[in-house]
Amino acid sequence: SINATDVKTNDAVTIKLTMDCFRSNGVTSGMVSLGGNVQTIGTKPDGSLWKVAIQNPTAEEDADFLGILETKDCAVITSGGYERYFEENGVRYHHIMDPATGKPAESDLTSVTIVSENGTLADGLSTALFVMGLDKAIAYWQAHASEFDAVLCTEDETLYVTEGIQDAFSANYPCEIIQQKGAES
């Protein structure tokens, strides 16, 4: 049997294999986008940074997005319960499972975007931080800030952006910068 988690993992693996093929064949500029998974190599051919829009999980139209991230040489991977779900008796059940309960995760986050040079890490963390919820996700980033950055979106469309990408991210909604532990406010 195949479930949504298997498909998502296959998206990340497909992108990794594609990027490995590009690199082994000398490609120095490119972008692959598959679902909520985006991976870039280098900059655009003109030398400018790639622009990756992060979808608004509560938007009724696809054209609405949380913001734009300018980037190069990294993965930008988003998880949220807004695309793969079903409704029964007025209750929405999404595909991101809480391993502690075996049920859809109850989270105060509507989406988690991870930015990392390691696409496999970003794929796993986008789901894990969604399950953790805002406070634990922030604490996790603060303990592992050298490995990834993040854009966390709450139900009220407040964005929490890690300081490592604050200058590269143009937000369309209220935004708070998450700083590393011990950093001055």
Positions of the model-derived regions?
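Mature catalytic core of soluble alpha/beta enzymes
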Residues: 1-185
